[in-house]
Amino acid sequence: MNKALTLLIAVAMTTSCNKDCITLNEQNYLVFGHFYGMCAGEGCVETYKLTDMKLYEDLIDDYSGQNLEFVELENETFAQVSDLVDFFPNQLLSEEETVFGCPDCSDGGGLFIQYSDNGNLKSWRIDQFQNNVPSYLHAFIDQVNEAIVLINN
């Protein structure tokens, strides 16, 4: 019994979130999207806002990510991408840098990521070319791109 309790505590400690894990609710949300400068059409700038219960799409499609106006999407679409937060690299929260690589410098596009923690915004622009960014971002880049594809299908 003592061994089982010790094992249970050890598992809980190693799998539980530390203070850097992000949580989503109405105030804490994740904004994600991509942008391509040398591009024409609706898909050049796509930005979304994910909360714990809903997914929203930006209507403005502002390349800079400064002007955002969101409308709610259907619950089925939310369900397809609601786990994106699980792939968010916690290390990103402690980064001093806000730009990784050279997003869209060679027409390869970039990702716009923003996290709101009780109104405190942190934003990043990330190069789509994974050779130009830290390896801990690679899986998240892939997941963001996959989420955008799922939303638009």
Show which residues each predicted segment covers.
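N-terminal hydrophobic targeting signals that begin at the initiator methionine
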Residues: 1-2, 18
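Sec-dependent signal peptide recognition
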Residues: 2-8
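C-terminal motif of bacterial Sec signal peptides marking the signal peptidase cleavage site
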Residues: 14-16
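Short, well-ordered, aromatic-rich surface patches in folded extracellular/luminal domains
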Residues: 20-40, 69-76, 94-153
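Post-signal-peptide N-terminal segment of Sec-exported extracytoplasmic proteins
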Residues: 36-68
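Non-transmembrane, membrane-adjacent beta-strand/coil modules in membrane-associated proteins
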Residues: 46, 86, 97-101
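A short-motif feature that recognizes glycine-rich, charge-decorated loops
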Residues: 58-93
